[in-house]
Amino acid sequence: MSKKITLLGSTGSIGTQSLDVIRAQGYEVFGLSAHSHVDKILEQIEEFHPKYVCMTNPDAAAKLDAALAGRANAPKLLTGPEGLKELAAMDGPDVVLNSVVGIAGLGASLTAIESGHDLALANKESLVTGGHLVTQAVAKHGVKLLPVDSEHSAIFQCLQDKESAKSLTKILLTASGGPFFGMKTEELRGKTKADALKHPNWNMGAKITIDSATLMNKGLELIEAVWLFGLPPEKIQIVVQRQSIIHSAVQYSDNSIIAQLGVPDMRIPIQYALTYPARVPGVVPELDFTTLKMLTFDVADEETFRCLAACKKAIKKGGLGPCAANGANEEAVKLFLEDKIGFLDIGRLVEAVVDSDSFGGSYTLADVYECDKMARAFVRSHL
């Protein structure tokens, strides 16, 4: 069955891999968005012929507008964060896939849900920063929330037997361990962005690759899993699975465990979200068990990797705690990639923000953005 897809964040790592899936399935692209990569989105417009395109960066939008001038059948151009929400709200697509990086994707997620669209969610920050708002909107509008993160897709797939899902007692959330697995604090002190960007298994963008190196990504995924699957954080166990073959598992009341396995390729969870509930042939090679010499399992070291410890504190505090942790991390990673702070400073700053307030209680969307702003300012003032 052909589908129409709106893809938010089309020029990033998840976005381009999503287009691999869309191309292979022969789906129609209704809308695309990017932040600033004009050349790449021009190539995508040429191939996929979307009806609408949004550029959230004003300078990039002006360049794209000039490049599209005079073209026959050029897409309508939307601009800025409001343009992104306008695109997410438009009637036409069967699914909106949100692969925007960071809290910038939250508004579009909420708008898509409130407009009645099924949402394939790669933007984990939507749930981390505004989990209560997102899950409340999903329930109110009766749409599907389809996880795209490989771990959450794995859990989602393991829970498709609705009767067994009632007996869920534990989630085993797997982690690769990142490029610095097994290292202690002193060994991490001099690590550079070049070191941190060398992920052993996954092809990802710069921000999420740094998050994998600090284990912040796993902390964010823990928070995301709490909102997606309704288990308290103490029932979600993080297990380091270095080969990234077991993508996560669930345990039931009889202590049986069901896991989802596959090659480490993001196009598997992307495809499952876009074709759900169907399973169809795709672009990813099958897993050859005869090549697997071993599968290893280890404990995540949150004493060394303080971002993970900070996220656990944040979700226990509740309220805006996870939002504060995320905002601090986004700002700290930006500074690290600009060579303005060291690798260990990321965890120090995230934990300091989480420790700075109680953060409990209910919140509005305005509160989320205010908390994010506060966390970023805290980081900049505590360098």
Question: Where do the PLM segments sit?
Answer:
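Catalytic, metal-anchored helix/loop core of enzyme active sites in primary metabolism
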Residues: 1-383
